Amino acid sequence: MRVWCDFTASAHPLVFRPLVELMQARSDTVEITARDYAQTLQLIEQHGMTATTIGHHGGRSRAGKARQLFSRLSGLRRWARGRGFDVALAHGSHELTITARRLGIPSATTFDYEWAWLQHQLGCRAATKVVVPDSIPIERLARYGTAPPKLLQYPGLKEEYYLSDFEPDAAVLDGWEIDPGRTLVVLRPPPDVSLYHRHANPLFPQTLQHLGRLESVHAIVLPRTEEQRDYVRSLALPSVIVPDEAVDAQSLIALSDLVVSAGGTMNREAAALGVPVYTTYGGRLGGVDEELIRQGRLRPLTDPRALELTKRAGGTAQRVRRDPAELLALLLSARDA
């Protein structure tokens, strides 16, 4: 079987790493395309995969995003035509499902946040199968032309599948002088925005300023873009550490005492690894985060002073591990639809 996967954001190599390994182990041919955005290309390489780079992020303007969308669609179509793919898979890449449909290739897309309206209008309608967590109410997806049998759902978090074989590597901390007596906090900024932009959610910068001045804390910030990296460094906060490049974020999370993130994936990785986690997300919560909050595995943050900055005892005893082969089977069902 010939399979095409498309990665457009940093989380996608993580999600697909075990799926690609499973397919390659049974002698399937897997080819990957990727958008040059954030740490996507670095993470592909770090996880032992190779990809053809097509396109880059269009920036914050609608015009820039539109130009890059059409440019990337054209590039993907030229690349994929004639390669004889049996199925195409993606995590939220509407470029893949649109291109696959035009080329007559069955496709499946998966995602775990249902309020990205334009992305899902494009991606879901073009896909053969749509695979989402069962914590997302089915009725929320009807607006995207998605319902059973096109819609398939899986239990738990996607992170519980791709982290099923994960064990943390303590060496991730070796590059910094970490005082084990201080509370180790990992922070992830909001996606695709300037932290200092006047329309940005002020809560994350406020949290960063608060933690960055506490002598009892090590605050490791994992920026999404070089712009964010430069801005955080310019603040010169004494307790803040900013890695120079992409790091083993999962190990960092597992070894931390606390995670504060404005983005969904790192929040859910922390929940899957049994680490206390706060969200500063200012948008509409999706079904996955709503369920995690009900379970007490995710806490909304409205004031940085409310953070419980304590050393964590234990490890990852609360972890849930799920079989990635089950997620892969749902995605590959597009081939037989």
Predicted region positions:
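Catalytic donor nucleotide-activated moiety binding site of glycosyltransferases and closely related
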Residues: 47-60, 208-243
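Donor nucleotide-activated moiety binding/catalytic core segment of transferases
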Residues: 72-79, 226-266
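A conserved, positively charged/aromatic
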Residues: 108-110, 120-132, 253
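Conserved nucleotide-sugar phosphate-binding/catalytic loop shared by glycosyltransferases and other
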Residues: 24-69
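A nucleotide-sugar donor-handling region in carbohydrate enzymes
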Residues: 131-200
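Leloir-type glycosyltransferase catalytic cores
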Residues: 147-178, 295-337
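A donor-sugar binding/catalytic signature common to diverse glycosyltransferases
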Residues: 88-99, 109-110, 252-289
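N-terminal subdomain of nucleotide-sugar transferases
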Residues: 1-33
